[in-house]
């Protein structure tokens, strides 16, 4: 009988023990699906009413964070390279469609504030920081080269970033996450139209939607 009572007491103590979310000194790792959805616009292309546009793409998203206090963290967003098709939109060149492609990596450095207490199961947060985007493997496809375009290059970009999200603790270590990010990404596309050097300023300014699982240690 005593053993039964002791066993029940232990179970009750365990079931009532708080699940600790993020607290000072914790490292936080998340991995999941990140979708980049551009909110793009550009200068007019080649003296027409057409603009350059960039499509959406989904890749593996990763974040690594460190809790300086129970409520404040520093976090880095990373991902596998995003691939985007570049197209013409509207005006005289809109019918060309996809004319090229590029890849980019968008490491983003954030300071985040977590609401609630260290033992809260649900931890919403907001953040602000700086995005760096580097473009690579830029090229025109057959449609672009047939239109006389060549030598595509996109400048790297620095810009402000912000996000909101939440973590939901499953136990003391594992949790689920959902977040939305916004980054100010502006670049200049340089290229040749025939033998003439051209440039077009492009604002990509994407929303990034991420669903992830996480682990803290």
Swiss-Prot record:
Quick one: signal sequence residues? Answer: 1-21
The protein's UniProt keywords, in alphabetical order, are: Cell outer membrane, Membrane, Signal, Transmembrane, Transmembrane beta strand
| Biological-process GO terms, alphabetical | transmembrane transport
GO cellular component labels: cell outer membrane; membrane
The places in or outside the cell where this protein is found are: Cell outer membrane
* Sequence similarity: Belongs to the OmpW/AlkL family.
Listed PANTHER family: OUTER MEMBRANE PROTEIN W, PTHR36920
The name on file for this protein is: Outer membrane protein W
């Amino acid at each position: 009988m005593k053993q039964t009572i002791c066993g029940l007491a232990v179970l009750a103590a365990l079931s009532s023990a708080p699940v600790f979310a993020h607290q000072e000194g914790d490292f936080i790792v998340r991995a999941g699906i990140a979708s980049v959805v551009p909110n793009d616009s550009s200068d007019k292309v080649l003296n027409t009413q057409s603009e350059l546009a960039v499509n959406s793409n989904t890749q593996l998203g990763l974040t690594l964070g460190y809790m300086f206090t129970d409520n404040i963290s520093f976090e880095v967003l990373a991902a596998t390279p995003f691939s985007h098709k570049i197209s013409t939109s509207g005006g005289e060149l809109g019918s060309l469609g996809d004319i090229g492609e590029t890849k980019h990596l968008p490491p983003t450095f954030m300071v985040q504030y977590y609401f609630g207490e260290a033992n809260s199961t649900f931890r919403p947060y907001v953040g602000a920081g700086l995005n760096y985007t580097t473009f690579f493997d830029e090229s025109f496809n057959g449609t672009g080269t047939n239109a006389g375009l060549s030598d595509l290059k996109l400048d790297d970009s620095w810009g402000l970033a912000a996000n909101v999200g939440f973590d939901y603790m499953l136990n003391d270590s594992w949790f689920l996450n959902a977040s939305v990010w916004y980054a100010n990404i502006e670049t200049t596309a340089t290229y040749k139209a025939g033998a003439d050097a051209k440039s077009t300023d492009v604002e990509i300014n994407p929303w990034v939607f991420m669903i992830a699982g996480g682990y803290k240690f």
